[in-house]
């Protein structure tokens, strides 16, 4: 089955992104919220809505396969990948992954995973959330 397009959509996760370093430096908990200054790059507040990217593969017969690129609660802490904001990472998916998939046969899950593991942006592997989500949509096709 040939992939004819790749579409990205900003989504929400089922939980929050928390700036763990700010919490450890004394951000005050007030129920479901935290008050204090952010410490980790990319955070606009100590606790903010979790974001994801739904990646949809449009197949030649009209079927749509999808996967959700989602990161962990404490992004950017303890050696984890940076905060996963859709506006920052949709352009990366569109630039580096779309061209690798559109026009190709969706016939090898292993091949997709190898391709994803080998893509580098500025000398770094793709964000874990991208590798996770894009492999989900391909798995639903193969």
Task: Name each model feature, range by range.
Residues 1-56:
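Short, Gly/Pro- and small/polar-rich lid/capping loops
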Residues 58-142:
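Metal- or metallocofactor-binding catalytic centers and their adjacent structured scaffolds
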């Amino acid at each position: 089955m040939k992939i004819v397009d790749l579409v990205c959509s900003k989504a929400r996760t089922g939980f929050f992104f928390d700036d763990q370093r700010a919490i450890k430096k004394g951000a005050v908990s007030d129920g479901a919220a935290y008050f204090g200054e952010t410490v980790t790059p990319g955070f606009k507040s100590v606790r903010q809505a979790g974001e994801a990217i739904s990646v949809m593969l449009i197949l030649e017969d009209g079927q749509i396969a999808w996967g959700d690129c989602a990161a962990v609660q404490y992004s950017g802490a303890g050696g984890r990948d940076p905060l996963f904001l859709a506006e920052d990472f949709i352009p990366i998916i569109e630039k580096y992954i779309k061209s690798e998939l559109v026009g190709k046969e969706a016939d090898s899950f292993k091949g997709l995973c190898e391709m994803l593991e080998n893509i580098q942006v500025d000398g770094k592997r793709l964000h874990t959330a991208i590798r996770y989500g894009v492999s989900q949509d391909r798995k639903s096709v193969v």
